[in-house]
Every structure is written in structure tokens, then in C-alpha cells.
Amino acid sequence: MYLELQKRLGSRLRGLLEEKYGLLVENIPLEIPPDLKFGELATPIAFELARKLRKAPRIIAQEIVSALNGLEGFAGFEVAGAGYINARLDRAAGVRLVVGGESLARASSGLHSLVEHTSINPNKAAHIGHLRNAILGDTFVRLLRAAGQKVDVQNYIDNTGVQVADVVVGFLHLEGLPAAEVRQLLEELKGKGERIDYYCWDLYARTSQWYEQGTAEENEARKELRYATLHEIEHGGNETAEVAEVISTAVLRRHLETMLRLDIEYDFLPRESEILHLRFWEAAFEQLKQTGVLYFETEGKNQGCWVMTRPATAGRPGAETTEGAFDEDAKVIVRSNGTVTYVGKDIAYHLWKFGLLGKDFGYKPFFTYPERETYPKHECWISAEHGDEPHPHFGGAQAIYNVIDSRQSDPQANVIQALRGMGYTAQADHYTHFGYEMVALTPRCAVEMGYDVSEEDLTRPYIEVSGRKGFGVKADDLIDKLIAATRAEVDARQTGGADAESGRQRIAEQIAIGALRYFMLKFTRNSVIAFDFKDALSFEGETGPYIQYAVVRARNIFRKGGTTPEAALAEFAGADAGAYLTGEAGEDIWALWLRAARRTLVLEQCIATSEPAYLAKHAFQLAQEFNNFYHKHHILTEEDPARKTFLLATAAVSLRELIEVLSWLGIESPEAM
């Protein structure tokens, strides 16, 4: 409702300014005042027009207000202060709009977006930092789909990188296991109910330490072994590459199973190995040379390298300096030994994402997702050199969002720069690096996870984790511990009755996953998160369980009243709510209706800023205002039938909106808690 009325007012103002002053103003600034005493919408447009019209802002505001009256959905307009225009809504009409509800299933926008998230190296178990990436990405996918966009969800798999090489070194040289015995180990672990990703977690830490535990000569030889292993994996067709394929594929399956616990799914898994073997880089290299984005450096520290011009160098070395000078700060894309840097391969990959490469992957089905409430049954595909036919089409997107931590901002900027240099301006403009900061642990959380914490670390606000050092929180361990803690709370409340074992377990899982997802989403992306069990699982304050409990509380109203939200709204349809929206009590209820009406407004804000935290905050504020309403008004014992109908409708709208915004956050709404 808020978004609809905001657009209505903006359109009327644009027309009025053109008609009255001959001005074409595309973007009309509209704000939500901090207090209802100033109305429900406001605009400072008069201040922006003062210089052009050579009038005082207040005079302009008065002229505009005199021509605005009679706009449907608005009770009136007034000038405030030095020239603000405050708009007051027709409250009864606003309630009718909210009851009708802006469509929960938005019409297709026609925009095809691609979101890449998670992208865990397939060399060990997922950890808590990976969860922030996956939850951010999955939530943003839900937001884009809620806005009517077609969204492909991709999870990039670097199965030929140095992290995989480290684990392969561990299997081949620390444990002495050739490919056949690695396969046998996988079967043995499966038979014992043990996990390959956990096994690799420990082996990766051991290998990382092994590189540094010998003499200087031994460590240098081990370093050479590491890069020789990496080269063999990249080249393919040998036993080293076979071990890498077996391990990375097995670990990848475990990652998908871990993420499924959080209701996170993918459509396509593009792998680094196919980008190499299908020669994506060679196709991109030709385009980069032809467009002048790359040049061959013949002098200086980058002699013998293919380097990318910076924006100011206009496609050739020395363009911004004296004749014959070379650009020491140019970005190396192909090293003097012929190897391609990470950025080079990433440029090729993103040309494919936009459908600009002229090459494609082969595709094979890899992982079947079961049918669930949130998603239909569907297949996740993986890249291959020679795929199956028919297959879905991936790539060719109009907009790209890469959920990659903030430390990768420079490489991401280089890819955007390359696209722009090649003339793909529209694609560069629709390439978003969805950056975020790290996840650490509070000292209390580290102790609860069983780690030895020094006296000094106990005084720190947070403790950083390191998979290379073996100090970190595995994602599944974290989820298991959250569920166990929640189950204890659910059992104490005897939710569902003493014999409802499966019901209580299901509720515990819903609360635990909701707590985790909300904790990861409530902080803005540029904030470091210090994870803490007690804070995440609290039923009070800005937490997932607090919002879920508001849903349960609303459902209980209808359960005890012997009715349903749908029936309450149907009974209220057509009634005049104006009489119940005045006075102090009426103001509070109207504020709740207004909060409920912000859903699509917040959705647009989240997408425009690539910031899901706005929706998390909205969900909390809606739950908070509903709880205040619940405590102030005795809905089921209200003696006035008409007022009771209105209060039930208020609860029904609050419940509907809470369930919807929680679903956009990937959080389920329990029936009981």
C-alpha cells in the first residue's frame, strides 16, 4: 500500500510541476516522516525548486499544496516549516488497500538476473563464514524473485585451485593413498557414517602445517611439490587430477547437503576445470586484445606480461605520461611464463555469464532436490566437457550479482573495468559485487564450541577463525548445536505435547535455522559479525525466534477464537475502519497497519541497495509493533462486535505480512513454540 500511494503521489507531483512551472522532474524525493504527527509521507521538493523558480521554498510549497487536494487515497496536504510538504493519508482507504493486499505473487518483470553465491572451495567442510555468504545470497535470490525477476542461482566451484591441491598433497604424500585407495576410503567413511568433508578439514590443516615444519630446504621442496600438484590438476588426465576430481566432487555433495538444511538450493554448478578445458580463456583473450583492453608489456617490472590498461591510459601504455613510459601499476592478466591470473579467468567466466563469450559449458544433472514447501522438486546441474541433451539454458543474464567477501573488491573491480573497456557498458553497469565482511566468534561462543581460549582472547570482542589452522566452526556442527539448544527449550515448554516427538523436533529445527539466518541477515553487509549462541537464540530482542513467536502468538488468536485469518479479513471487507483509527489507541493501531503496508517498499529498497538487512529490520519492527498491539488490546474478549472484527482484521494482516517477509528471509513460521 505504501509503495502504491508513494508512486501515486510522485506521479501527481511530476505532472503538476510540468503543468504549473514547465519543469520536468524525473525523481521526486518522498520520505516517511519520523512521527505520525507530520503525516505519513513528506517531500522536500520545494527546497530543490527554489533556485530554479527564484522563490522561497515555503511559497512554492503553498502553491503546490493548493493544487494537490483531491488526490485519491490522501486526506490532505499541508506546508510545514520552511517549505516541507506533509501528506496525510485517508486512513480508512489505506486500511482497505492493505486488506486487499498488494499481490504476494508479483508479475514477471522480464528481467533475467544471475546470482552467484556460496562458492566454497571443495577441499573441506563448510564453515560459519561460508554460511553468511550462502544466507545473504539465498535471501537476495528470494527478494529478486519476489520482485518478479527470473533468477538463476549459481555456485562456482574452484575444483582446480591451490586449496584442493593442498588436500591432494595430503592424500598422496602425507597419507600415501593413490586414487583407487582414495575411492576405497570414501566407501569406508560412508559405511561408518563418517564424513569426507570433516576428514579433509583435518587433513587440510595438517598439510598446511607440514609445509612449514621441515628445514628450509625441505619446506622449499614441499612448496615446489604443492605447485607441481596444482599444475597436474589444472592439466588433467593424470592420477593427481583424478584424486582431485574424486575428492572435490565428494566434498561438493556434502556442501549441497549442508546448505539444504538451511533451505538453500542452486540451479547450476560451474566448475573451474571446465573453464580451463573448454578454453574459455582463449576466447576471452582474443576479445580483450582486439578491443585494446590488453597489451603486451616490453619494459619494466611487467616485461613479457599481458597487462590490462587502467581507465586513464586509454588502451595503450604511456598514454598518460611521457612518450616511451610504461605503466608500473597496470594489472597483469597473463604472466610472463604464460599462466593466466585469477582475474583473467574471471573475465572469461563473466563474459559467459552475460552471454558474450561465444562458448558454453556442457551440462550434466548432479543433485536432485526433493519437493518441499518453498521449492518444487528440481535438478541442480553441473558443468562438464561433454554434457547431456537436452539441458536447461544457463548464462546470458541481463544483471549479475556476485556474493563474494569484501577482500575481493579489487579483483571484482578489475572484471568490471575489463567489461567496460571492451565496450560492454550496459553489462558493466549491471554487475554488482555483493560484498560482505567476515564472521568471527564471541569468546563465549568459542568456549561453548570446545576451543581453548586464552585469557587475553577472553577480553576481546571477537575471535577470528582460520580453517588453515584448524580453528573454526564447521557449519553442520553449528547447526546441530543450535538445534540441540532449541530442542531443550522446546521440550521445557512441552510444545505439541509429551508424545509429539517429531513435532517438537521439527519446531526446534525451524527455530534454530530461523535464528541462524536472522542473525546473519540483521547486520549490514559491511559489518563484522561476532556470532554468539545466546544472542542468536534469544526469544527477546532483535532475533529470529522473537519474530517467529509473534507469528505463533497471532496464530493462537485465531485458533482460540475458532476462526481463521482469511475469515476475519472477509468479514471485515467493506467495513469503515476510520472510527477505530483516531485517538491515542487508534494512532498505535494505525502505526501497525502502516508498518504492515511497507512490505513492497522495503523490498524495492533492499534490491536497490543490495542490502537484505533492511528487510530483517522491517520484520523485527513489525513483530515488535504487533506484540505491543497484542498486549494493549484484549481481542477475543472485546464486547463490541464491530471493533472485535476490526481487531481480528488487524491481527490477520499482521500475521499475513509477518509470514510473507519471513519467507523472503528464508525463515519458516512455526505453528507452535
Question: Where do the language-model regions lie?
Answer:
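Short, charged, solvent-exposed linker or helix-capping segments at domain edges/interfaces
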Residues: R96-E102
